[in-house]
Regions:
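Generic hydrophobic transmembrane alpha-helix motif, especially the helices
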Residues: 101-137, 145
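Short cytoplasmic-facing helical segments at TM-TM junctions of multi-pass membrane proteins
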Residues: 141-180
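Transmembrane-helix boundary motif in ABC transporter permease subunits
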Residues: 72-100
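Membrane-embedded alpha-helices of multi-pass transport/permease systems
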Residues: 78-83, 125-154, 185-194, 241-242
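Transmembrane alpha-helices
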Residues: 128, 132, 165-198, 230-233, ...
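Hydrophobic alpha-helical transmembrane segments of polytopic membrane proteins
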Residues: 208-246
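Transmembrane alpha-helical segments of polytopic membrane transport and secretion proteins
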Residues: 1-22, 240-259
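Periplasmic/extracellular loop-to-transmembrane helix junction in inner-membrane transport proteins
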Residues: 7-10, 33-75
Length: 259
């Protein structure tokens, strides 16, 4: 009984959680199968819809298109945000960069026209709309990380003979790299939530978001669930991949994280 009690006590050390996770997954699947809500398709119906989408609707091709779009937007948003974050450490740039974080309140419907004029085709339009949305949120959190740098850290860098942009590189870029990777990983998930909206606006370019909008238009619930679960699985794999990259570049994270 004592060992079971430890599983519901916060921060209590326990053994492996793999068996517990498998058990919970099995329970959820059973509840899903016996659910009385007929509006929610069961797993077998979703599997049949997934096969139909993959063989007749080109879902895997559309997923690849969306993956390229997301990857491009993540790269551009991360590069822009990191560049602005470095500039933010200089007082002259702080007001304008702080103001840029307010752009996260703008909706895509009101700015699509301008991005249409600035881009050459639908693929570029999707990438830059996503980049805009992701950058606004990523920048807000990145500035919070930079503001968390203490005066003691800055003074310590100065005692080592570092000043100006070199101090910024050591204290902010290298010193907060693991936190920046976590932000990018979280922002990548935000990108998938924005994707359907963007691909719905630029539907002629395709993508899994456009396919989802088409299925939603016809209230094809089996297909909707199949697409959503496909995005969910892909997003989880993407999250693990980004976390793995972070652990490779910042191996000290594993030593400082609570298990």
């Amino acid at each position: 009984v004592g060992s079971l009690k430890s599983y519901v006590v916060p921060f209590e050390p326990v053994g492996s959680l793999k068996i517990l996770a498998i058990g919970q997954a099995i329970i959820l699947l059973v509840l899903w199968f016996i659910s009385p809500y007929k509006l929610i398709p069961n797993p077998l119906e979703i599997l049949q819809a997934w096969e139909m989408l993959a063989t007749t609707q080109g879902m895997l091709v559309e997923l690849w298109k969306s993956s390229v779009t997301i990857a491009s937007a993540i790269f551009y948003a991360s590069a822009i945000t990191l560049g602005l974050g470095v500039l933010y450490t200089a007082p002259a740039f702080k007001p304008i960069i702080r103001w840029m974080t307010s752009l996260r309140f703008l909706g895509f419907a009101g700015i699509t026209f301008f991005f249409t004029l600035w881009t050459s085709d639908g693929a570029a339009l999707k990438i830059w709309l996503l980049t805009f949305g992701m950058t606004a949120f990523l920048l807000t959190n990145m500035l919070a990380i930079i503001d968390s740098v203490t005066q003691e850290e800055i003074d310590y860098a100065k005692t080592l003979g570092l000043s100006g942009w070199r101090a910024t590189f050591e204290v902010v870029v290298r010193g907060r790299m693991d936190e920046a990777f976590d932000l990018i990983r979280q922002n990548a998930a935000i990108g998938w939530t924005l994707l359907s909206m963007v691909e719905g606006l630029v539907r002629y370019e395709g993508g899994i978001g456009a396919l989802l909008m088409n299925m939603s238009k016809h209230l094809n619930l089996d297909a909707i669930f199949a697409i959503q679960l496909t995005i969910l699985v892909y997003g989880i794999l993407q999250d693990y991949a980004l976390r793995w990259i972070r652990n490779i570049i910042c191996p000290y994270v594993a030593l400082t994280s609570a298990r």
